[in-house]
């Protein structure tokens, strides 16, 4: 039987506010346990929550960015459940009236096609604390630093049909929240976590199958692996005569398997009701327009502009626009070098390779945009060749200064004097007289292969400094003259 996969995602983004959503406690990551928890966060009696206006602004920003309905009358609710790291015995969230309603996001797939993914809603809520199972033998420690940290939970429609589509969607959300400056997107620190709802159904069937939710997956690679593992588990289970049970599961990267955590709850299990300590939030039109005016150019618009303004391919434009820092770096390189396609190639390939090897983000690049732009300018004005440029780039990455400083210090300036190149070619051809005779006696097909040998010898003789175009032209004339 052929199966169709149905995937919906819940993405929890930690908002980059200075303080928590209902208290003045700091949200700094990595502080000593329980040093950033106020009486409000601890759920002490007699204290009241006060809503963080900046968290509201950030949620509205996201809603506007995904063309969503904004809940101008939204309400906080209590989500009731017991867990040791939830000190109040309930989580303040939103249920019936969220701050962000229906919207959508277009994702670009590997084959270049664009698919629209519906966004059901996005709501504000507070994060829970953290249980520390490994720090105490036979006991569990509770760190409440994270309790009350503002989250925006983004819930998608079940519109994805493969793990790769799900990853593309998460990457698109990741890019948008970073562009907006509302979340740092640091998945290793838990700033962006994903719950994956996965079900299967016979191809052509309209009704959904029974879904399972994989909780708290925190990397793009693990999202893909966890979903594929769960898909295969459900297929094997049904084809062996079993039945999928609705449940919450955890992904174990060591075994590449999902395992049952608990039965999956429905909304009514949490007994939601409006929080009596918090008034409904009224968002005025003026607040909406003020927030809309602060929206930056977002990845889809930037991608389109890169294609139209710089003549880049869809793929190149998508890669360069995938992060705000990379897009800004690229544009600065272009403004200095004047050659967008050359800049795109160097930023994506050479610089990308360097950053991957060193485990750095582009904002930590050892080669600044000014340095790279200056070097590319020396390629376009024929001061250096592309081959020499790689040596210059490596030197800049090692802290040897600007391109001009490296070129002058190492004597790498390209030889463009025709007389000097001709003299060098004459010496090289004389040293390879036998190969010259073979070349002249060969047919056109063999000559093409042999010509590369002479070019290599010429560049070796000039230590890579001779202008490759001049070498090709003069060499051809001498060999066929």
Curated annotation (Swiss-Prot):
Keyword Ligase: yes
Catalyzed reactions per annotation: L-glutamyl-tRNA(Gln) + L-glutamine + ATP + H2O = L-glutaminyl-tRNA(Gln) + L-glutamate + ADP + phosphate + H(+); L-aspartyl-tRNA(Asn) + L-glutamine + ATP + H2O = L-asparaginyl-tRNA(Asn) + L-glutamate + ADP + phosphate + 2 H(+)
EC number: 6.3.5.-
Keywords per UniProt: ATP-binding, Ligase, Nucleotide-binding, Protein biosynthesis
Enzyme class: ligase
A Pfam family assignment: GatB_N
Task performed by this protein: Allows the formation of correctly charged Asn-tRNA(Asn) or Gln-tRNA(Gln) through the transamidation of misacylated Asp-tRNA(Asn) or Glu-tRNA(Gln) in organisms which lack either or both of asparaginyl-tRNA or glutaminyl-tRNA synthetases. The reaction takes place in the presence of glutamine and ATP through an activated phospho-Asp-tRNA(Asn) or phospho-Glu-tRNA(Gln).
Subunit annotation: Heterotrimer of A, B and C subunits.
Name this polypeptide is given: Aspartyl/glutamyl-tRNA(Asn/Gln) amidotransferase subunit B
């Amino acid at each position: 039987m052929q199966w169709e996969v149905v995937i919906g995602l819940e993405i929890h983004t930690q908002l980059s506010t200075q303080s928590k959503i209902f208290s003045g406690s700091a949200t700094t990551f990595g502080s000593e346990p329980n040093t950033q928890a106020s009486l409000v966060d601890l759920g002490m009696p007699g204290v009241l929550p006060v809503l963080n206006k900046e968290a509201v602004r950030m949620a509205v920003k996201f809603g506007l960015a995904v063309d969503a309905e904004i809940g101008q009358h939204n309400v906080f609710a209590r989500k009731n459940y017991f867990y040791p790291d939830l000190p109040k015995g309930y989580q303040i969230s939103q249920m019936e009236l969220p701050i962000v309603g229906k919207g959508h996001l277009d994702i670009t797939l590997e084959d270049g096609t664009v698919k629209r993914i519906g966004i059901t809603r996005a709501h504000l809520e507070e994060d829970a604390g953290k249980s520390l199972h490994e720090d105490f033998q036979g006991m569990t420690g509770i760190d409440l630093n994270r309790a009350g940290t503002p989250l925006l939970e983004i819930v998608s429609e079940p519109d994805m049909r493969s793990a790769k589509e799900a990853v593309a969607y998460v990457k698109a959300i990741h890019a948008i929240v970073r562009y907006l400056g509302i979340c740092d997107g640091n998945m290793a620190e838990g700033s962006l976590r994903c719950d994956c709802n996965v079900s299967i159904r016979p191809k052509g069937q309209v009704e959904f199958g029974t879904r399972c939710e994989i909780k708290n997956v925190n990397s793009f690679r693990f999202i893909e692996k966890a979903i594929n593992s769960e898909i295969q588990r459900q297929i094997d289970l049904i084809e062996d005569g079993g039945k999928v049970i609705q449940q919450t599961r955890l992904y174990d990267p060591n075994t590449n398997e999902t395992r049952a955590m608990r039965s999956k709850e429905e909304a009514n299990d949490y007994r939601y009701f409006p929080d009596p300590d918090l008034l409904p939030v009224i968002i005025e039109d003026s607040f909406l327009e003020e927030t809309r005016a602060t929206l930056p150019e977002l990845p889809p618009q930037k991608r389109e502009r890169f294609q139209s303004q710089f003549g880049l391919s869809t793929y190149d434009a998508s890669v360069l626009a995938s992060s705000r820092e990379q897009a800004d770096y690229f544009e600065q390189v272009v403004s200095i070098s004047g050659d967008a396609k050359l800049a795109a190639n160097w930023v994506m390939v050479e610089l990308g390779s360097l950053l991957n090897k060193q485990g750095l983000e582009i904002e930590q690049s050892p080669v600044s945009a000014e340095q790279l732009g200056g070097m590319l300018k020396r390629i376009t004005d024929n001061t250096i060749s592309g081959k020499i440029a790689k040596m210059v780039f490596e030197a800049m990455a090692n802290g040897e200064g600007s391109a001009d400083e490296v070129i002058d210090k190492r004597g790498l300036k390209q030889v463009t004097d025709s007389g000097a190149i001709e003299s060098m070619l004459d010496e090289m051809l004389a040293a390879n007289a036998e190969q010259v005779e073979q070349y002249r006696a060969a047919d056109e097909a063999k000559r093409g292969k042999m010509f590369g040998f002479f070019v290599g010898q010429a560049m070796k003789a000039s230590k890579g400094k001779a202008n490759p175009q001049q070498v090709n032209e003069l060499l051809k004339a001498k060999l066929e003259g």
